[in-house]
Amino acid sequence: MRSIYVLIALLSCQVFSGCGQPNVAAPNNKTLNPATTESIAPDGNQFINPDGMTIKSRILLPEGFKRPTYRVEEFGNFLENLPLYPIDQEVHYYNGKIKPRNNIYNSVVKLDIGKRDLHQCADAVMRLRADYLYQQKRYKDIKFNFLSDSKPRTYTSYAKGNYSYPTYWKYLEYVFAYANTASLHDELPSVKTTQEVKIGDTFIQKGSPIGHAIIVVDLAKDSTGKTIVLLAQSYMPAQEIQILNNWNNSTLSPWYDIDQDIIKTPEWTFYPKNLKTWE
């Protein structure tokens, strides 16, 4: 009888995390709803500068493309200047174990993810947006809706005047535990067409029971207006943010042309209707 009570208690305490509902880590040997591909393209390294230590300095541009110029206070400037680990660094899970490259990613963003299994896919997207706002001291703008009631939990209410980084990180883990792909999907407005994509936009699928989210961390255009983007993700179990390779076009990888009917990434398949933006 005691074991039954314990089981009921455990089930009632499930928390919701970024990639799924509830927060159940995927086994290491299982990929959820993977993108399908007949063959894995070789690592595209023609656009990789191994000495670069930010997204902008490491990922080179294809001929004819230019990055937009962002003001220092813009989200785009924050994202393309995200710090990276050395080129040979592999992704670490929250527990210190390593996620093999398997041609999934080419670079790892140098940001701490904590010691709990919380920093998953939508969490990483929310975290980057929050980190940008925190850096700009726009504390009142840091807020995310919870899955339970679709109401925002604000950083200012949580911090109560204490805007130190430890308090900020506690707030983020609070959000990670009770917001996920479903809540973020419903919170953000849709983008009408992928041709209108902006840096910082995110592809989100709510999923049933598991969803996924990735974020546009860089963008470039050519003289005709054609747009290419870099995509980044975290995943399950909680792991460091990684810049994704493009299995569909090894001559363009890691850049993506998302003006397609289907956007296949190494671990998930998205569609134009999944593109969301920040208000």
Please provide the spans of the model-predicted regions.
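Cationic-aromatic interfacial patches
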Residues: 22-110, 119
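Low-complexity, Gly/Ser/Thr/Pro-rich intrinsically disordered linker/tail segments
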Residues: 227-230, 234-279
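Substrate-binding/catalytic groove segments of enzymes
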Residues: 134-138, 211-213, 222-227, 239-242
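C-terminal motif of bacterial Sec signal peptides marking the signal peptidase cleavage site
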Residues: 15-18
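Sec-dependent N-terminal signal peptides
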Residues: 6-10
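Positively charged n-region of N-terminal signal peptides that target proteins for export
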Residues: 1-4
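...with weaker cross-activation on analogous glycine-rich loops/strands in unrelated enzymes
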Residues: 168-225
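Extracellular-facing segments of soluble proteins and assemblies that are Gly/Ser/Thr-biased and enriched
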Residues: 110-192
